[in-house]
Amino acid sequence: MNDIISLLQSKKTTDVRKAAKFLQKNLMPELEDLVIEAFQRESLRNQKSWETRCELINCIGINDYKKATPLLEHIAEINEEFDTVTSCAGKALIRVKRKDKSDVSELLKRLNTMGYSLGYGMLDALGYDKMQPSNEDIRTIIDAVWDFGKNIGKGFCAPRYGLVAACAGWEPSLVRDFLLHCIATGDVPVKYVAENSLKGKYVRLR
């Protein structure tokens, strides 16, 4: 543990990033404060440290470091449209604020205001964590994001990817039309996941 603490406290962003990646695979709740402090320091660096901030945010979400909630909420409120840090914060915010894997209240709260990146991250949490919202919440989410990200330019990933993956474990009658709609868009990764979700099969996500 001392080695990880030293890396988190290092002045080198590469060291901090190494520690954050380690903590995504080796949970250490006792390092919550140090991870948050590391994120705050990295936020004061220039924009080149965005990769490290993303890894720290991923670490926060996976370890369920709830003390970081205000930091994540701040990023979500800024709601930057095309920003990887914001996407990571969206996923982590779902994780630290939910009571269990049926709780999508944070997503519902931001459904009508979230931009591309925030929405991308929040919807990813549904699929990567195989969340199980109520049928009512499923209907609400699908109706709200039916065409979410439709007009994004080339080179951007489809933000509904995580949602499409989550549909594999949901009531088929609630998701069938949505999945067929996603297949029809022609996006190759989404089409692959949607076809498997129609069969009730979870796939390995990117």
Task: Please tell me what each predicted stretch does.
Residues 42-49, 77-87:
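Short, flexible, glycine-rich and Lys/Arg-enriched loop motifs at helix boundaries
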